[in-house]
Amino acid sequence: MEKQLPRGCKIIEFPLAVDDRGALSFAEGARHIPFQIERVFWIYDVPEGKTRGGHSHCETAEVVIPLNGSFTITVDDGRHSAEVRMESSGKGILIPQGVWCHLHDFAPGTICLVFASHPYDASGYINDYSEYLNEQLSVVRYDLSRQTEWDSFVRISKNGTFLLERGYMDYHAARFTDCSLMFYKKGNLIAMLPANWKEEEGTVQSHGGLTYGGLIVSPSMVAINVLEVFSCAIDWMKRELGAHRWLYKPIPYIYSSIPAEEDLYALFRSGAVLKERGISSVIDCSNRLPMRQSRKSGCVKAAKSGLRIEQGNMTSHLEAFWNILAGILNEKHGKNPVHTVSELQLLHSRFPENIKLFVALKEESVEAGALIYDTGKVVHTQYLASSEYGKRNGALDLLLRNLIDDVYSDRTYFDFGVSTEDGGAFLNEGLIFQKEGFGARSIVYDTYEMLF
């Protein structure tokens, strides 16, 4: 029964003791009532054909119990409606704030007891159903006509980055079936979900083509709003797509302008399980640890070898860097970088201030490089690579120290990226040791799985 009830509604079974003297049920505060009780009232002597309720509460949650007799309660969250016949004094129904309800079909002699989370406040009711529906959350699937609105929201959100703007997301749109969602309340956009649909697997990914792609939210969003958005998103996925699985990559906290981990709680409440965990090395630029001596020695060696650091161009320098990178990946893993040269050039043309290449040059030869993604608060090394000459002469050490100490010294975090493979099952110990040598320590990039 509970699975078919609207958002947050729940049947509560109270303890029952029965002997030859009769039956006794009881409720002991928080053990049985999921809020602090601030008000208790009871309804009785309801004339035949009359109803009670017919409203929703802006803040108050209630537990409704038939102490005697029976009645039917209709609960409605604007998307789902259910009727429940209440006829056992040992059972109640939880009505969360924001759920419409009305009581009807009272049996003669019925007594209805109500526990409430807040004192009475006449201004805390919505009594008009049309007004109530206007207050409810609505969801729209993204299309190209909404690109400007999407990008504008990313920029004012508390956890969005340029990777979540459509100019970045859609560079490889042909590889994915987009099913990104936009959530509105009272006509205002309050949250967005970058997502793609894998029909053959019945799976929604948020997002399969991005390092992270969790819920993008406005600064005003609070925990209960995000719970509502998650419920709405899951309902939409099941109803519109027939999905039964959702893979979710939260946006790591370092990218948020203010705390924004309400989605992690919503994942827990939705029964999500941790599927993958990558470990990334990050420098807190306001509380830096010293570089290891081995990294300092590399910098000295690089300087003595005549290597110089400069911002690279996105033509010849990028091609030379990509060839070094591709050679390393092909040798170790038998694959090329995720992005081609032309894709990186396209993305740079769309985000010239966010995507930059820095190189270590020996005369005019590229011996090491770092492709940087700059979100304003966080600098992320999307790709790092060094030639054999560069490795022998500390080229990356000098390049990275220059970026950390000089070019991006005013940023909050410097993120080297993950050092794990196979969903986190394998840790490249040499790679993470190198990153930690610059004073970096770990955060995680997670993927959660929800089945429904």
What are these regions, as identified by a protein language model?
Residues 140-202, 250-390:
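A conserved beta-strand-loop-helix scaffold within acyl/acetyltransferase catalytic domains
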Residues 210-259:
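A gly/proline- and charged-residue-enriched helix-loop-helix capping module
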